Amino acid sequence: MKHAILSALFLLAASPMIPAEKPSWRQATDAELASLLPARAPVVKEHIETELRTASGIVNGHGRYIAGIVLITAGYSADGKYSHYLVVQAPIRIGGVPLKPGEYVFGYTHSGDVLTVHFNEASTGALVGTADAHLIAGSSRVASLRIWPPGEKALIQIGRFGIPYELSEK
């Protein structure tokens, strides 16, 4: 009995030394995305309609999401500036652009085999950074937005183009 108690105490004392397992990421379900993403996204001073069937995202074991959805911008001042709304609940670097937890919008300009994607804060419209999306090699289905889990591709797909991303521990 003493031996069992001593063993238990040792394991409790040693547990902070055992590194915590990194939370694994998986594709978010349609129901999860519907409960997370707004039907009307707050963009600067407007609430712009979104299209739920275009939603895509990933979620980790702690319930933190990286998710996005297409904006229906026709008739709004954002028309031509932004095409997608993005919710970030864990730090991420997309094509070299660091995004801390928050809400963002992004749009792009198309030039040949490259999309130049500009990321902006959703609440202010302030530019956070730009990144290039390149044609995805091989045959890939075209998607208005797809956020691939990091175990598969670590890629944000816009149409036939992709931007690599890295999740941050901080």
State where each predicted segment sits.
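Mid-length scaffold segments of soluble, non-membrane domains
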Residues: 73-124
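Primarily secretory-pathway and cell-envelope proteins
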Residues: 18-76, 126-170
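Generic detection of intrinsically disordered/low-complexity segments and helix-coil linkers/edges
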Residues: 4-5, 19, 98
